[in-house]
Amino acid sequence: FILPYSVDMLMTAILAVFFQALSTSKYMGWGLMVVYLVASITLVSLGFEHPLYNFGDVGFVMVSDLNGADVGGEKSWWLRLYWGGICAILSVIAYLLWRRGVAVSLRAQLARVPARLVGAPALIALIGLGVSTTTGGWMFYQMNVVNEYVISDEQEEQLADYEKQFLQYENVKQPSTTHVQLDVDLYPHAGRALFKGSYTLINDTGAPVEELHVLFQDGYSDLTELDIPGGTLTLDEQEDYGYQIYALEPAMAPGETLEMRFAAERIHNGFSTRGEDTRLVKNGTFLNNA
């Protein structure tokens, strides 16, 4: 705990010093820091949630006795490196703008910056720029290209659309599961798990079942194979909503059983902004068939 929190507090302290360097008085510097604290909370609630533009955001880290800081720990240190580069630049700017002797206006201080930006300050600023640009670009690729960046409002909108589209099927009678067979290959250090299995279903509704509704909503796993004897895919919203409908030909008679086979995979790709997978970890993996 000590090292990561010390780094986080140091970055906040550097930002506070930077605000003081921009201000004509210490009270104005305090005021700017208060504005930053309020804005950081307000902007997140307005949808500005990306850790690459929320100062000092290092993501979520779950610490446990079994798994240490494996969940989110690597991403948090990459983000600290990114923000560390930016803090190096802020430190140089604060040093160059710091008032020495007779007080002068901020405009006059800014005018002197190019002449002062030589030697060690220039080198530190250049290194900070290189570190923040390189790590920031790589993290953006991991979070926005390899993974999908979705803000909370979009997730809520997607949930509302799901309810509007599929609420009509709420009371559709479906067969019950009587037996589950599941084979799992775990590769915890690679962040990967492969699943193969089957569900034995029985039509206990008292009436023929003409359609089978399949719901697979796991943001960390992909359904790679689904075999339903006599089933024809008539609705496929798997990518957006995890919902599929299969027409059964012939219809499933009362008391009849059916074996549905499937395969799926769970893979950790890059870094995600939507939260960490706390189920598949290096030590202490916990999975269920829900």
Label every PLM stretch briefly.
Residues L3-A290:
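Acidic/His-enriched low-complexity segments
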